[in-house]
Design a protein with these regions (language model features):
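Charge-rich, low-complexity N-terminal segments
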Residues: 1-57, 63-132
Length: 132
């Protein structure tokens, strides 16, 4: 059994395989090796891949360039995930090829929202100091 990463609860093996899948998905999208119709895969960024403990399922967090049409992009990737998986099988030499579930990556929107709240809080503190 692998060692557990204390801050996330993922094993080293999950992290290593996830990173390997992430790198290869990025290459597949850049080179359009999956030949997915109706979207330009060159504009898709894979921000993170999380593996299940049995390494049979990979959650790929994706975001299209500019964050536009995210829901549409994820639904097309999900529809053609068998093509992505086939392209991935040519690149990876692992016992079980994981099933890929594509997920919208909203972390940038979340970070932007937090940054706005921090700026608003700093502005309020500055105004309070000015009037005291």
């Amino acid at each position: 059994m692998g060692k557990t990463n204390s801050n996330q609860g993922y094993t080293q093996r999950q992290l290593r395989v996830g990173e390997l899948v992430k790198q290869n998905l990025g290459e597949i999208f850049i080179r359009n090796e999956a030949k997915i119709p109706s979207i330009n895969t060159k504009i898709i960024t894979v921000t993170e891949v999380r593996m299940t403990p049995d390494l049979k399922t990979a959650r790929a967090y994706v975001i299209p360039l500019g964050g536009e049409k995210m829901t549409e992009t994820v639904s097309v990737l999900t529809e053609y995930s068998h093509l992505v998986r086939r392209a991935l099988s040519k690149k990876l030499d692992i016992k079980f090829l994981p099933k890929i579930k594509f997920v919208e990556d909203n972390s940038f929107e979340y970070a932007e929202k937090i940054e706005k709240l921090i700026k608003k809080n700093k502005k309020n503190e500055t105004e309070k100091k000015r009037y005291n």
